């Protein structure tokens, strides 16, 4: 099951009783702030996990169509590492 930002804002609306517009604004602001922080430094949310940008180096590869060697450009990847508490919670609910 996929949880969208819209579903999260509806959950906030039902729990807190705020308007739909305010809940959407809160969710969008939280996610945009998480992304902005994660772009420049490691972001750790206690009992949830951490977000970190990792730089992948340029590396050699092969063009599948022509079989010729190519250089794959360097790029940044956003990584999420779940906390031990989140892992335990997920594993507990799977049993």
Curated annotation (Swiss-Prot):
It comes from the Bacteria. Gene3D superfamilies: IHF-like DNA-binding proteins (4.10.520.10). The keyword Transcription regulation does not apply. Pfam families: Bac_DNA_binding (PF00216). InterPro entries: Hist_DNA-bd, IHF-like_DNA-bd_dom_sf. One of its GO terms (cellular component) is cytosol. GO terms for molecular function: DNA binding; structural constituent of chromatin. Keywords: DNA-binding. SMART domains: BHL. PANTHER family: DNA-BINDING PROTEIN HU, INTEGRATION HOST FACTOR SUBUNIT ALPHA. Belongs to the bacterial histone-like protein family. This is Histone-like DNA-binding protein.
